[in-house]
Amino acid sequence: MKTYLQLLEHILQHGVEKSDRTGTGTLSVFGYQMRFDLAQGFPLVTTKKLHTRSIVHELLWFLRGDTNISYLKENGVTIWDEWADNNGDLGPVYGKQWRSWPTADGRTIDQLSEVVQQIKSNPDSRRLIVSAWNVGELDKMALMPCHALFQFYVANNKLSCQLYQRSADVFLGVPFNIASYSLLTHMVAQQCNLDVAEFIWTGGDCHLYLNHLEQAQIQLTREPLPLPSLAIKRKPASLFDYAYEDFEFLNYQSHPAIKAPIAV
């Protein structure tokens, strides 16, 4: 995962100081891309320990079309707690947009189901896109989508995925996002009887919060360890039928966790 460390270093060297919605302040660069060959290992950051349980359960929660944190709480995941209302609701965030995007005529569109079917029936399509950036519902969301849009691509019987992340909390958020979308790529590939190729991460406003700079510098002193591999233990009937127990990260070694405050 030297690629990720290079992004940390790039921001520390070239970032400009900016104000932000949370009032914390950031060092920021605009426009950055990282590529991960999924055949060479699963891209879990090894220079600090990641909570893989949160990564897997959050993705399963998105895939359920759920926007209430009760499922996450039941499974020991707290990463959305700060944004939920008193009933645990977040408004029409990722899961709602992925699975039931509302149309002007009162229908809803299951973007993910449609894309999986398109990959199977028309793998050369250039329209294999899922968007969470629903302009008409942004003001109802507890947090507007940071990872806003992703696109699949099939070549040589292998599946790639590219994510566009308009706002990237590089120390806390991006390691989760890389792992989450890499996991999704593996799952979609399995459902479509494809091998995996690349996960490509493209960031817009890529930033380190000013109260994360010391933590980023600590991480840069650590030598990356070999990447783990992902085992998917069964192939369920659909993309939406996976369970937490279906996934195992084999030989995940990491340096200790590094604590950092969340900017709300």
Swiss-Prot record:
Pfam families assigned: Thymidylat_synt
Molecular function GO terms recorded: thymidylate synthase activity
Active site (record annotation): 146
Record localization: Cytoplasm
Assigned keywords, A-Z: Cytoplasm, Methyltransferase, Nucleotide biosynthesis, Transferase
Positions bound to (6R)-5,10-methylene-5,6,7,8-tetrahydrofolate: 51, 169, 263
GO biological process: dTMP biosynthetic process; dTTP biosynthetic process; methylation
Reactions accelerated catalytically: dUMP + (6R)-5,10-methylene-5,6,7,8-tetrahydrofolate = 7,8-dihydrofolate + dTMP
Pathway: Pyrimidine metabolism; dTTP biosynthesis
Subunit structure: Homodimer.
Name assigned to this protein: Thymidylate synthase
Organism: Legionella pneumophila subsp. pneumophila (strain Philadelphia 1 / ATCC 33152 / DSM 7513)
Gene field: thyA
